[in-house]
Design a protein with these regions (language model features):
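A short, charged, amphipathic alpha-helix used as a generic interaction element across diverse proteins
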Residues: 21-38
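S-adenosyl-L-methionine
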Residues: 57-76, 304-333
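Glycine-centered tight beta-turn/hairpin loop motif at sheet-sheet or coil-to-beta transitions
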Residues: 10-12, 62
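A contiguous, mid-protein "functional segment" used to position or interact
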Residues: 288-306, 310
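Short, mixed-charge low-complexity intrinsically disordered segments
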Residues: 35-56
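Core catalytic lobe of class I
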Residues: 53-296, 339-344
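A short, exposed loop/beta-hairpin motif centered on an aromatic-Gly-Thr core
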Residues: 12-20
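Short aromatic-glycine-(Arg/Gly/Cys) micro-motifs in beta-strand/loop hairpins
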Residues: 1-10
Length: 344
C-alpha cells in the first residue's frame, strides 16, 4: 500500500516590536515575514514530527464509501479489519479476441490485460491467493459471494473448498435480456453463476430468509434468479465492461447482511457493490487496479448523494422498490458499534 508521510518541522523565534496594540504588533511582524525580512533557520529549530497515513483514492463524507487504488492481493495484507460480507467479480480470463453483440452492434469481447488468461495452473494459483486473503478479512460468521462463468467458476469452487469454506448455494443468474449468439453453433450464453459460501463449516451465517420470501411473492427464494442485465441508466457515469446490475447486488446484500454491515469488493470496477450497499444502509470498501474505473466509482457515489437520484434509484431496483413500499423502516440506518470503522 502507498503511504503519505507528512514531516512537520516546528521553528520558533520571538520578535520584539514597538506598536500601539497587540493586534498592530502582530500585523507588523506578519508583514515583515511576508517580505522575508524575517527568515527562520536551523537555529530556530524546536521539534520535528512524522505522521504516516494510507493514500486513499476516495472516502465519502459520510464515511460509508471508500476506494483504494492498487492490487488487492497486495493491499489486503496492509490493514487489519474484518468484514461482514465480501462480493467478488474476479477476472473471468475470457479476453481472447472473440466477438459478441451489444446494442445491435458487433463488439470485441476483450476487456483488457487484467482479463487475459494464463495456464489453468496459474489461474488456480491466482484464485487461491486472493480468496485466501479475503478469508482473513471475513468475520467468523461472514460470507463471500463470487461471480463467474464456466471460464473460471470451477477453479473458484475448488479454491473455496481447499481453503475451508462451506459452499451454501450456487446461484444461477438467468439474464432476461442476454446478447445473441452470432456463431449459431451452440446455445446462447444467458447465465452467470454466483457462489455463496461461508467462512466456517461450524459457525452459523446470516440469511434473511423472511425478506427473501417477501420479495418473491411469499414463496421461498430459489437459486435461479430471473433478473435483467445492466440497464443504460446504470452507466450514466461511465462504462465498465463487466458491470453488474444493481438488481443482482441488491438481492445479494439484502439476503446476507444487516443494516450497518461492512462489505468488501476486492475487484470493485465501477462499484455496483458499493452503490447497492449505500442504497441499503450498508458501508463499503472497494479496491481496484484501474484508476479509470475508480473515477467512475467516485462519480457514481457523488451522484447518489443527490436526494432525488437516491430516491430514483430505489424506485428502479425491483427488490428495493417492493420493500420500500411494504416495509420502509427496513432501510433505517443502525448505529455503528463504537470504533467499528476502517483504519484509514
Amino acid at each position: 500500500m502507498e503511504y503519505q508521510v507528512t514531516i512537520t518541522e516546528i521553528l520558533s523565534r520571538t520578535e520584539r516590536v514597538e506598536a500601539s496594540s497587540a493586534l498592530m504588533a502582530e500585523k507588523m511582524v506578519r508583514l515583515r515575514y511576508a517580505k522575508e525580512d524575517i527568515v527562520l533557520d536551523y537555529s530556530d529549530f524546536k521539534s520535528v514530527d512524522f505522521h504516516t497515513s494510507e493514500s486513499l483514492f476516495f472516502k465519502s463524507e459520510d464515511r460509508a464509501f471508500t476506494l483504494l487504488h492498487g492490487d488487492s492481493t497486495r493491499l489486503l495484507n496492509e490493514f487489519d479489519f474484518k468484514f461482514d460480507m465480501i462480493f467478488a467479480d474476479p477476472p473471468y480470463f475470457l479476453s481472447n479476441g472473440g466477438i459478441s453483440i451489444q446494442s445491435g452492434r458487433v463488439v470485441c469481447v476483450d476487456k483488457g490485460e487484467w482479463d487475459r488468461g494464463g495456464t489453468p495452473e496459474s489461474i488456480d494459483a491466482f484464485n487461491r491467493e486472493w480468496i485466501s486473503l479475503c478469508r482473513n478479512k471475513l468475520k467468523d460468521n461472514g460470507t463471500i459471494w463470487i461471480s463467474g462463468t464456466y471460464h473460471n467458476i470451477f477453479s473458484v469452487a475448488n479454491a473455496l473448498t481447499e481453503l475451508g469454506f462451506k459452499i451454501l448455494n450456487v446461484i444461477t443468474w438467468a439474464k432476461t435480456n442476454p446478447p445473441p449468439n452470432i456463431s449459431c453453433r451452440y446455445f446462447t450464453y444467458s447465465t452467470e453463476f454466483i457462489i455463496w459460501a461461508r467462512k466456517s463449516e461450524k459457525v452459523p451465517h446470516f440469511y434473511n430468509y423472511d425478506l427473501m420470501k417477501q420479495v418473491n411473492e411469499g414463496k421461498q427464494m430459489r437459486d435461479v434468479w430471473q433478473l435483467p442485465a445492466i440497464a443504460p441508466w446504470e452507466k450514466r457515469c461511465g462504462k465498465h465492461p463487466t458491470q453488474k446490475p444493481l438488481s443482482v447486488l441488491s438481492r445479494i446484500i439484502l439476503a446476507s447482511t444487516k443494516p450497518g454491515a461492512w462489505i468488501l469488493d476486492p475487484f470493485t470496477g465501477s462499484s455496483t457493490t458499493g452503490i447497492a450497499a449505500n442504497l441499503l444502509g450498508r458501508r463499503f470498501l472497494g479496491i481496484d487496479k484501474e484508476e479509470e474505473y475508480l473515477e467512475i466509482s467516485r462519480a457514481r457515489k457523488l451522484e447518489l448523494e443527490d436526494v432525488r437520484t437516491f430516491a430514483s434509484y430505489r424506485k428502479k431496483v425491483k427488490d428495493i422498490a417492493l420493500l420500500d413500499k411494504d416495509s420502509p423502516s427496513l432501510f433505517a440506518h443502525e448505529e455503528a458499534p463504537p470504533g467499528y470503522d476502517l483504519p484509514f
